[in-house]
Every structure is written in structure tokens, then in C-alpha cells.
């Protein structure tokens, strides 16, 4: 399975450091945030990761590339622990990148992956949202898709005020199929969704958080939507159209 990681954002909330360092490369403990995303995808069985980037993001690709000179120097110096860290990229899924020429929204970013993904279902991981490694969220989402088919998105319980910054969803609880590692009450069908609604239009206490498993039909849907919230092409509008939501 492919994973698409939109990574073209400017990171304005982290200025001034993001003038020269991609926000995805900012450290979380001892490694860049983007490594946690690729590790999460790999741990869920994904073998191919596509970064959707822009100019100035070359450091992301470089981080997951071989550097034979450094590896040889570390080996020669007997710095085995450092060499092990440097070589961790070899354990991860293959990585690729494509440019998003214009910042026209998340839906537009996902469209840039169409030729790479082809006609297969794929995952989307938003690098701003880091998950607890032990949660196995993506693996559980794959279980849901295998059991029920269709597209799967992750939901987060939020306050009404917080919901105005997310895609707010109307939901109905579903029974959990055998073989899916969820508790009763954790599996829901989305019956309505609104991107960043005003407070009086929040649909429930559940909002979409940055993990998706999508059918390739979403590409056709994204090609036929109008700009939404913020004048951008929203992924929310694309998958809502794909599954027939108003």
C-alpha cells in the first residue's frame, strides 16, 4: 500500500526557524518529526511513502537517502551506535517525492499523488499530527477497511470550540467486526462533514484528525470540486463527494 504525506506547508506558526528548516524536520526528542510519520507507516505494513513537497523541502528527501561517505567514516571510526542511527532509514518504507507547485489546499496536494498511487487504495498521513507509537491507529484503520471496505478516516473527540478548527462530523455508531482491534463505540459511520464550521454549525464532538485510508475514486472527486474553506481545495470536500455526502 502507498502512503501520501503532504509536506508543502510553510510552517508559519514556527517562524522564524521555518525560514530555513522545513517544519517536518523540526526535532521531536532526538529525531525529526517526519521520521515518526514514516516509521508509523512502515509499522502498519506500508511499503511506499510519497512526500508532496515544494521548493525548499529538499532536506526531507535527503534525510531518508543514503550517505555512503558518512557511513564509511562512522564505520572506520568504530562509532557503531551512531552508524546504527544513520542506517535506520534502511528499515523504513521506500520514499519518493513530488512537487505541489501552488499552495491550493490539502485536496490539491493529494491530487499531485494521482499518477504515483494509480488505482489502488492509499493512506494519507498529515505530518502535523503525531500519533502515540503504541496506538497502532493506522494498523487498526487498515483492519476496518479489510473488514468493511470503503474509505476510513480517524476521528478525535474535541470540544465545540476546538471543532471549528477541524472537519466536524456527524456520526452513527457501528458494531465492531470480528478481527478489528477496536472497542465497542469506537467505530462510526460518518453521515455528514463540514470543514472548519462556525460554532453554531458544529456537528458533534468528533472531528477528523490527520489519518485517512482512501479509495482512488477520491481523485475524480477532487478534480470536480470547487474551492472551499479559505479558497482552497479541501480533502474533506473530495471524500464527502466521493461517498455521496451533502
Regions inferred by a protein language model and the residue ranges of each:
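Catalytic-core segments of class I nucleotidyltransferases/pyrophosphorylases
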Residues: 123, 142-146, 174-246
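Short loop/turn motifs at secondary-structure junctions
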Residues: 45-46, 118, 147, 189
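Conserved beta-strand segments of alpha/beta enzyme cores
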Residues: 24, 94-96, 189
